[in-house]
């Protein structure tokens, strides 16, 4: 791993509550659409999901471009141009189900769920990337102590599941390599400092060989955190499931041909 994100995208969402207002004005329900506007959302799947044009690190650089697009349930994604070689994340365009520094949760998502409920969250994703520079392809899963998370609710924990990466490395320290859900993962544990004096735990599972397709049961990972390592209480709530690309710099496009999240 060559680079570590020292200014993660999560801090942006805690520090700028004014963004909430702009998000309300830039949400679209689509059959087929695209947008290059900062923080735009394209809703689909009966509003269960949305594509989010998250460009939280844009102030670090000029001349950037990023566009999200949705054509159909088997044709969606985003492209980007971030002319930078610094070791900080510039953007996290993503697919979102549930909460994301918002007032509540997406419709029909089944979220939030308390870990003690023993429900399973399964997710499937298939994608291809053509890109240069530094980036990853990763799930981002957020936890709170409440089932009523709002736009100003700071999370207590974050679970990242890296399916692929190029020249990028997770925050925190390497702990061990584990086998979960038919795959091998390098486990990292760290802490995200927020400028408001708070912060949260971040747990990253990095696929040891990389994959462009995954069928995950999120409980495999939360059981490891709660039961095996006792790093997290089962009283916490899973608030959201995202999949996106943390982009440090470069040019590229991701095409997603399968995406779903189900709570059972």
From Swiss-Prot:
GO biological process annotation, one example: cellulose catabolic process
Gene3D superfamilies: 2.60.120.180
EC number: 3.2.1.4
One GO MF term: cellulase activity
Secretion signal span: 1-32
Keywords noted in UniProt: Carbohydrate metabolism, Cellulose degradation, Glycosidase, Hydrolase, Polysaccharide degradation, Signal
Catalytic reactions on record: Endohydrolysis of (1->4)-beta-D-glucosidic linkages in cellulose, lichenin and cereal beta-D-glucans
InterPro entries (alphabetical): ConA-like_dom_sf, GH11/12, GH12
Pfam families for the chain: Glyco_hydro_12
Family per similarity comment: Belongs to the glycosyl hydrolase 12 (cellulase H) family.
PANTHER family in alphabetical order: BLR1656 PROTEIN, XYLOGLUCAN-SPECIFIC ENDO-BETA-1,4-GLUCANASE A
Protein name: Endoglucanase S
């Amino acid at each position: 791993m060559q680079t570590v994100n020292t200014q993660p995208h999560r801090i942006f969402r805690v520090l700028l509550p004014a963004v909430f207002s702009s998000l309300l004005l830039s949400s679209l329900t689509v059959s087929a659409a695209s947008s290059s506007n900062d923080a735009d959302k394209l809703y689909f799947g009966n509003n269960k999901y949305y594509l989010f044009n998250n460009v939280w690190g844009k102030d670090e650089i000029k001349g950037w471009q990023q566009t999200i697009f949705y054509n159909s349930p088997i044709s969606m994604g985003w492209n980007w141009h971030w002319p930078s070689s610094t070791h900080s994340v510039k953007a996290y365009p993503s697919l979102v189900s549930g909460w994301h520094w918002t007032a509540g949760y997406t419709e029909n998502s089944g979220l939030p769920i308390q870990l003690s409920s023993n429900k399973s969250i399964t997710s499937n994703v298939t994608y291809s990337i053509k890109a240069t520079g530094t980036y990853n392809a990763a799930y981002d899963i957020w936890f709170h102590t409440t089932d009523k998370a709002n736009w100003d609710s700071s999370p207590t924990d974050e679970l990242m599941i890296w399916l692929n990466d190029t020249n990028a490395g997770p925050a925190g320290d390497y702990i061990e390599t584990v086998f979960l859900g038919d795959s091998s993962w390098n486990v990292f544990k760290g802490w995200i400092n927020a400028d408001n004096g708070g912060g949260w735990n971040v747990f990253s599972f990095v696929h040891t060989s990389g994959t462009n397709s995954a069928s995950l049961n999120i409980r495999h990972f939360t059981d490891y955190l709660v039961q095996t390592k006792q790093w997290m209480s089962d009283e916490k709530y899973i608030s959201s499931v995202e999949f996106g690309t943390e982009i440090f710099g470069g040019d590229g496009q991701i095409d997603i041909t399968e995406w779903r999240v189900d709570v059972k």
